[in-house]
């Protein structure tokens, strides 16, 4: 849809350039052909309209793939208001195409922190007043937190929140433990078809792409340090190994550390004997002095701290593929070192003091996306086929919670339902099956005898709840 086709008088949006809508529409049509699970759900539930009456507040990266998600939610009966969960991740043509379709959206690439907060507010507010929303779709937890702290009255009507990412799930679990969470949540992140596809295979595809776009560096033969070896770390390490890099991994979890060793990566620590006492003396300067690229993948804070940044090799590339920019101590860099913008989302950080700098100075770091998500700041993120699984899970999770009607329950029933849980395995398998069909694959069916032998039904689910894929 081009801007010319926008509903007359529609002004409930703010994007960078509405004239980009036709470009966004062309890309969205291509993305639809690469998202068989999501489009399969759209066709399957179109007549049933399971989200009719749903009013969804959405805050997730405003990309072309998200445009397909939004239009699927709308096709299944929902109304939505949308913003991006990251100041650099919006694809402006995608936001324009959604606005041109008459859907409220507030997102553009390169927002300031203040503009980001404003966009979150506009997601919640319609004509200056809180919209009568009844569902939340979040990525990272900023929207959920804002609703709890500033607009708690909105939550009285909300049936639940579906959370996309590790960081947001951690925040939800923390709120639940403290008795602060007011609505139930579905942990979309830990669905197998999200965590293994998006977190692992998506990062395998998009990390090296973003680094190369941002730096134009050849990566082969250089040394990389991947901080963290969860699903995101696993995909990131593979991504850099594919480029011919010499990849080292650092971990705090013995199980993930063992997996890194088994996968053939050298397990190291940036700290002498693995102990960070907060001083420069605890840093393994011999190790960090050889590192050409460091990437954080953890969702934790200051995993690349000031002392590590001081010890890194001259001209090393520093980036993050976790959710927030606090994995890298960018606050220290802003306070103590001079920043020189090379191009959007690429900075030389001169380690020669704050203020002025010599352009010929060679003691600098190259920081990508200001320490925020590198794959969406310096590139276009995961491909459509990867996001297909994640967003199909989001649709099923929205349907699941909307049908539960939490807001209409008695206080006693609400107390029982106030949880943070993953989708039922059967729905995870439904997404996986649609993805397999999209690849042209054929899944073998169990015979009744075989199903009985392993104690499952022919239709599934096929694995016990505790099974680790």
Curated annotation (Swiss-Prot):
Localization in the cell: Cytoplasm
Superkingdom to which the source organism belongs: Bacteria
GO terms (BP aspect): L-homocysteine biosynthetic process; one-carbon metabolic process; S-adenosylmethionine cycle
Pathway: Amino-acid biosynthesis; L-homocysteine biosynthesis; L-homocysteine from S-adenosyl-L-homocysteine: step 1/1
Binding of NAD(+), residues: 165-167, 199, 228-233, 251, 300, 321-323, 375
Cofactor(s) of this protein: NAD(+)
Molecular function terms, GO-annotated: adenosylhomocysteinase activity
Family the entry assigns: Belongs to the adenosylhomocysteinase family.
Listed name of the protein: Adenosylhomocysteinase
Native organism: Pseudomonas putida (strain GB-1)
């Amino acid at each position: 849809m081009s801007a010319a086709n926008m509903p007359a008088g529609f002004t409930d949006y703010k994007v960078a350039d509405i004239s980009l809508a036709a470009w966004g529409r062309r890309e969205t049509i291509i993305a639809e052909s690469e998202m068989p699970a999501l489009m399969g759900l759209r066709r399957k539930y179109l007549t049933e309209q399971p989200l009719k009456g749903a009013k969804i507040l959405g805050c997730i990266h405003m990309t072309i793939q998200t445009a397909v998600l939004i239009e699927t939610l709308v096709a299944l009966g929902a109304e939505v208001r949308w913003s991006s969960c990251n100041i650099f991740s919006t694809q402006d043509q995608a936001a324009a195409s959604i606005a041109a379709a008459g859907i409220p959206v507030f997102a553009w690439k390169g927002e300031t922190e203040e503009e980001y907060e404003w966009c979150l507010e506009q997601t919640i507010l319609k004509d200056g007043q809180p919209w009568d929303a009844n569902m939340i779709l979040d990525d990272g937890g900023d929207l959920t937190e804002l609703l709890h702290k500033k607009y708690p009255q909105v939550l009285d009507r909300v049936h639940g929140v579906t959370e996309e990412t590790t960081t947001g799930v951690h925040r939800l679990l923390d709120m639940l433990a403290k008795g602060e969470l007011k609505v139930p949540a579905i942990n979309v992140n830990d669905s197998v078809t999200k965590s293994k596809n998006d977190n692992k295979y998506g990062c395998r595809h998009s990390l090296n792409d973003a680094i190369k776009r941002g730096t134009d560096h050849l990566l082969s033969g250089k040394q990389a340090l991947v901080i963290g070896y969860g699903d995101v770390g696993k995909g990131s390490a593979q991504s850099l190994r594919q480029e011919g890099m010499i990849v080292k991994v650092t971990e705090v979890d013995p199980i993930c550390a063992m997996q890194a060793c088994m996968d053939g990566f050298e397990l190291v620590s940036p700290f002498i004997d693995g102990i960070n006492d907060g001083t420069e003396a605890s840093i393994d300067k011999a190790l960090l002095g050889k590192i050409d690229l460091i990437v954080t993948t953890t969702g934790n804070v200051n995993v690349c701290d000031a002392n590590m940044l001081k010890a890194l090799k001259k001209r090393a590339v520093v980036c993050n593929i976790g959710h927030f920019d606090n994995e890298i101590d960018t606050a220290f860099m802003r306070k103590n070192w001079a920043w020189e913008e090379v191009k959007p989302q690429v900075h030389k950080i001169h380690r020669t003091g704050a203020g002025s700098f010599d352009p010929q100075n060679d003691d600098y770091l190259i920081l990508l996306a200001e320490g925020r998500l590198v794959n969406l700041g310096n590139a276009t993120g995961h491909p459509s086929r990867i996001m297909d699984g994640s967003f199909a899970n989001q649709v099923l999770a929205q349907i699941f919670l909307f049908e539960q009607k939490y807001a209409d329950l008695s206080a006693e029933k609400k107390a029982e339902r106030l949880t943070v849980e993953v989708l039922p395995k059967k729905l995870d398998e439904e997404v996986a099956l649609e993805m397999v069909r999209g690849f042209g694959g054929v899944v073998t069916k169990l015979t009744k005898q075989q199903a009985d032998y392993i104690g499952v039904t022919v239709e599934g689910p096929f694995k016990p709840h505790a099974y680790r894929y």
